[in-house]
């Protein structure tokens, strides 16, 4: 089983959704400030995906990756960007996901030169100018998904291998939905994730 779910953060972080899906103990752990809404929305989405109202606090394994204490056989990963949240859930080993809203970023050419492999940089350079920014986000999300599946830190983007061809033993897939770029990395084949996408709305809760 491999599920990929996306949703808007505001409706998934309402007081009603939070009270229904998150336990008091988990709600007590919520951060304050600008991270709060995305934190709540991600956990509401996770609770809905596993069918657990009153989701208990998550625990962490020896490598620092969170897991569900009542469903330890399920691996999951959350990502958020500019008002949207994504969840990948699997019962077949570790997963990683990344979602980014395709948007201008003044420093993206220098980031690509610093982080991407020569192969990736050559691919970007060969594209028409208008296609380079979306391709940058495609490479970026694939790298993030790979590193998150491995449990690596974001700074290790600099050390990740080229991701045009995934490393042996893992599978990478990505898709674009309107202005969103989504990538998933899993231990099992995950091609055509665009066809797997589920959308979680307030009405579904």
Residue positions per predicted region:
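Core catalytic alpha/beta fold that binds nucleotide/phospho-ligands
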Residues: 1-205
